UniProtKB/Swiss-Prot annotation:
It is found in: Secreted, Extracellular space, Extracellular matrix. It catalyses: Hydrolysis of terminal non-reducing alpha-L-arabinofuranoside residues in alpha-L-arabinosides. GO terms for cellular component: extracellular region. PANTHER family: ALPHA-L-ARABINOFURANOSIDASE 1 (PTHR31776), ALPHA-L-ARABINOFURANOSIDASE 2 (PTHR31776:SF21). Its EC number is 3.2.1.55, 3.2.1.-. Belongs to the glycosyl hydrolase 51 family. This is Alpha-L-arabinofuranosidase 2. Glycans are attached at N48, N180, N199, N210, N361, N522, N548.
Amino acid sequence: MDMETSWRFLRSVCLLSFILGSFSVYQTLCLVDAQEDAIVTLQVDASNVTRRPIPETLFGIFFEEINHAGAGGLWAELVSNRGFEAGGQIIPSNIWPWSIIGDESSIYVVTDRSSCFERNKIALRMEVLCDSNSCPLGGVGVYNPGYWGMNIEEGKKYKVVLYVRSTGDIDVSVSFTSSNGSVTLASENIIALASDLLNWTKKEMLLEANGTDNGARLQFTTTKKGSIWFDQVSAMPMDTYKGHGFRNDLFQMMVDLKPRFIRFPGGCFVEGDWLGNAFRWKETVRAWEERPGHYGDVWKYWTDDGLGHFEFFQLAEDLGASPIWVFNNGISHNDQVETKNVMPFVQEAIDGIEFARGDSNSTWGSVRAAMGHPEPFELKYVAVGNEDCFKSYYRGNYLEFYNAIKKAYPDIKIISNCDASAKPLDHPADYFDYHIYTLARDLFSKSHDFDNTPRNGPKAFVSEYAVNKADAKNGNLLAALGEAAFLLGLEKNSDIVEMVSYAPLFVNTNDRRWIPDAIVFNSSHLYGTPSYWVQHFFTESSGATLLNSTLKGKTSSVEASAISFQTNGKDYIQIKAVNFGEQSVNLKVAVTGLMAKFYGSKKKVLTSASVMDENSFSNPNMIVPQESLLEMTEQEDLMFVLPPHSFSSFDLLTESENVIKMPISDSYKKTSTM
């Protein structure tokens, strides 16, 4: 081959390579463009023919005493084991978390059964062996660190109550101090003669903090020799919600979800591992000093039951939410009461309803009235047990409760533990309870599980749902997206699903019995997990109108819904969509059946750089909804971009004579979030 021929051949090869390479790049670019331009269409029918009202009760909350959600959490009592009963009734008993200040040569501390409270006989006796000349500087005594440290804030006031008696004169310093006692944040002395303390005497004081410490403790110290008894010690911040005892910041986190109901007090907390440790409402009412408290053996900690039957109903009222009371039906995790012997439990349930609904002259209504609430609470729903359907005596016991309650209170709606989503129940019920905990991908796929549930039976109450397996970690974006898709499915099936709540609601970071949870807190700080923020996307859903919608295109990673709602006299169509995939998705929204223009749009997006990202105390707002305003263009269809691994909502302001306007009851007025 000569030189010229060689150059021609080489040029041909280069040209061919360039053409083939260009074609390959072109194909790649076309593929990328195709991916970027791929459109998923949500067809929305806004006409009156297909619209359907969403139940007023659809989204609520479930409060269980787990993870120190109440004791050391929502219930603002700072003292743990305030009556010294946690160590049991055999004396001498363990006084944990109380600790002694001083050594064995200067003080001796022991429990005895000398209390003036018949249901709480344990008291603390403090034998002071030293005097002002021999006691260590600052004196000797006892201290209580509360629940992993008390949050004492400068300028705030705290009410301290205690019962005391003595065989001699006393001079006791009652103080909030730093965790090691070296810094005094607030203090007052109890000075009394022996003649004034021969019998148990109640002492109250208001301490104002001159410093801040979120790991503080309450301590009693003295340098006066003698015997002193203490019992029923309480320390409460004065700024609880309406003075009702609820920690303000945690209460506000619940309020912001606009819950339409609150299910309480459990959960497994209601059952107990053994019936002897189950929650029994009658032991949680009347004055707090008279409540014996109990050991919750499922979640392995003591509760003084300051957050009791009365307080739960007060909480529901303060939230503007319907109470759903779950009571024990004679069944725990490990033992059961046979149906022939269950009537005492039935009577306890009837009495519990009377406590809430009875007039102030009734037996149990008078107890409620004496506690400061003469008017009855609203109670429309009760649940017979928790997750007990497959226990051998459940159905027999359930029928005893059902018949007795319907006879006494025919309007009350009764919730069965048995799942009717796949097959009919074999017993009467107004609602059936449905619980699901699973992987994120699995929960995403279950968004259509209620599509084929029979509509002629009891309604569904999805009272516990969450992604809680390994891929959820402590509460990440991945878990939240799976839950968001599931909730969209429940919203679209709200003709059968009438109530929904996440579980668990709270976790004290010092006692993570169950993870993940919606709200994480310690003594002074808190944050919402992505699962909490997902629920914010549904605050307008209860009582709104569901619009018939259909997704078309490659929708394996997308779920969406459409509703209309009204707030402050303005009408909105809200589009919500989950993108569970790794690529952005273009969402075209085509609305028919509505002669209206969209005058504005508010976009809200929940996403993060990594699907495994979590919020934390150091970065509590890493994953929170980001809101922005969108300008609307003059076009028939709407186009939105769904970022990878995201949950988005679009509130479209409409204006037309034909716009959907749903009446809103006085009890469910909506406030603007614009």
